[in-house]
From Swiss-Prot:
Primary gene name: Etv1
Disruption phenotype: Significant reduction in the number of tyrosine hydroxylase (TH)-positive cells in the olfactory bulb.
Alphabetized GO MF terms: DNA-binding transcription activator activity, RNA polymerase II-specific; DNA-binding transcription factor activity; RNA polymerase II cis-regulatory region sequence-specific DNA binding
Positions of disulphide bridges: none
Originating organism: Mus musculus
Protein's UniProt name: ETS translocation variant 1
Length: 477
């Protein structure tokens, strides 16, 4: 009995298994063929549509491949920085109800192949059919505003690749009726940069319009540009109006421009020059305008007088003892040597070291070193001597102002007309106030080394004390 059951049981089981296999084999074959046929049909339809529609979209948009790689990352970067949970209008997908059903049927297929980005996009494709079908068609001006109007409580269910989705809307604005091709282009795009989402701050930013760069990065380009160039202000305000919600964060950069400071600076510069020109003509009350016009060229030499506003009005008359020449004529800083010589010749008190010879415009330096010394006092050059003065006079030979009289020492003459000479030397009929020896001593106490003064003063007592000694010993000692 045991052996029979041992032999009979496999036989019975074999018959039952054989009969069961015979009945189930056609069913399994039919299922496998049906699955393979559906799989091949779905995959062929999917990839064929992807390739065809992607080529169609690229042909219509005419966007290079490098631009396609960078556009979605930049919007994802801006959304990552601003952290706005937004839901964007998706009108091109709303008329395609077949696409949503196809995406819902393709979810198991896509998930089995590990296309997480495709699965997320298909999940996104279903949502605009439920909540955003009655929205208006997109326009270039309404696309940036759409995050404000479509922020809803169900935005938390939006997957993360959807945040990178609005990056395609501005570049695709040139395609009015591209409803289905945009989906596949986005699907292919979103399947690529999902792995590179963390290092987004290093991605390029070429494919973005200017107004969305301003919306996504308001604090980087605009404070320095708005601070210096005020003509960017209307463009900036226009972009903030287009930006909608992003315009609420822009008033602080607008306050950085500090327009009152710029206008105050612009108004200070001409006012400083105008005050300077008025103090040039301080003593020339009847013809103040002529005095200003005469010194337009050399006016830049003493522009630092603008830093001392308390000396514009009353202190100019007390400045003969200072370094600058003080009154209207010398304040310009243009007192030349020939003008200085004319001023010395015009004063009869200086006739003991310089005087007219009486032969036209000839004059003689009776004491040339004294003339050189006074010129050094006038220009604050204590080392001035006649050699340096004569070299300066040679410059006027070439200019045709004066000449050296041949055969006579220290005799010169002016070659121009006397009236023209005095009109140029004394504009506005104002004589320059020349510095004296007392002023020179006051200046030397503060600024000039006293070597020359010490030699002249210490030599006399030494000469009186050293009379019994030989001159050489006393001089060396």
């Amino acid at each position: 009995m045991d052996g029979f059951y041992d032999q009979q049981v496999p036989y019975v089981v074999t018959n039952s298994q054989r009969g069961r296999n015979c009945t189930e084999k056609p069913t399994n074959v039919r299922k496998r063929k049906f699955i393979n046929r559906d799989l091949a049909h779905d995959s062929e339809e999917l990839f064929q549509d992807l390739s065809q529609l992607q080529e169609t979209w690229l042909a219509e948009a005419q966007v290079p491949d490098n631009d396609e790689q960078f556009v979605p990352d930049y919007q994802a970067e801006s959304l990552a920085f601003h952290g706005l949970p937004l839901k964007i209008k998706k009108e091109p997908h709303s008329p395609c109800s077949e696409l949503g059903s196809a995406c819902s049927q393709e979810q198991p297929f896509k998930f089995s192949y590990g296309e997480k980005c495709l699965y997320n996009v298909s999940a996104y494709d279903q949502k605009p059919q439920v909540g955003m079908r009655p929205s208006n068609p997109p326009t270039p001006s309404s696309t940036p505003v759409s995050p404000l109007h479509h922020a809803s409580p169900n935005t938390a269910h939006t997957p993360k690749p959807d945040r990178a989705f609005p990056a395609h809307l501005p570049p695709s604005q040139s395609i009015p009726d591209s409803t289905y091709p945009m989906d596949h282009r986005f699907r292919r795009q979103l399947s690529e940069p999902c792995n590179s989402f963390p290092p987004l701050p290093t991605m390029p930013r070429e494919g973005r319009p200017m107004y969305q760069r301003q919306m996504s990065e308001p604090n980087i380009p605009f404070p320095p540009q708005g601070f210096k160039q005020e003509y960017h202000d209307p463009v900036y305000e226009h972009t903030t109006m287009v930006g909608g919600a992003a315009s609420q964060s822009f008033p602080p950069p607008l306050m950085i421009k500090q327009e009152p400071r710029d206008f105050a600076y612009d108004s200070e510069v001409p006012s400083c020059h105008s005050i300077y020109m008025r103090q040039e003509g301080f003593l020339a009350h009847p013809s103040r305008t002529e005095g200003c016009m005469f010194e337009k060229g050399p006016r830049q030499f003493y522009d630092d007088t603008c830093v001392v506003p308390e000396k514009f009005d009353g202190d100019i008359k007390q400045e003969p003892g200072m370094y600058r020449e003080g009154p209207t004529y010398q304040r310009r800083g243009s007192l030349q040597l020939w003008q200085f010589l004319v001023a010395l010749l015009d004063d009869p008190s200086n006739s003991h070291f310089i005087a007219w010879t009486g032969r036209g415009m000839e004059f003689k330096l009776i004491e040339p070193e004294e003339v050189a010394r006074r010129w050094g006092i006038q220009k604050n050059r204590p080392a001035m001597n006649y050699d340096k003065l004569s070299r300066s006079l040679r410059y006027y030979y070439e200019k045709g102002i004066m000449q050296k009289v041949a055969g006579e020492r220290y005799v010169y003459k002016f070659v121009c007309d006397p009236e023209a000479l005095f009109s140029m030397a004394f504009p506005d009929n104002q004589r320059p106030l020349l510095k004296t020896d007392m002023e020179r001593h006051i200046n030397e106490e503060d600024t000039v080394p006293l070597s020359h003064f010490d030699e002249s003063m210490t030599y006399m007592p030494e000469g009186g004390c050293c009379n019994p000694h030989p001159y050489n010993e006393g001089y060396v000692y």
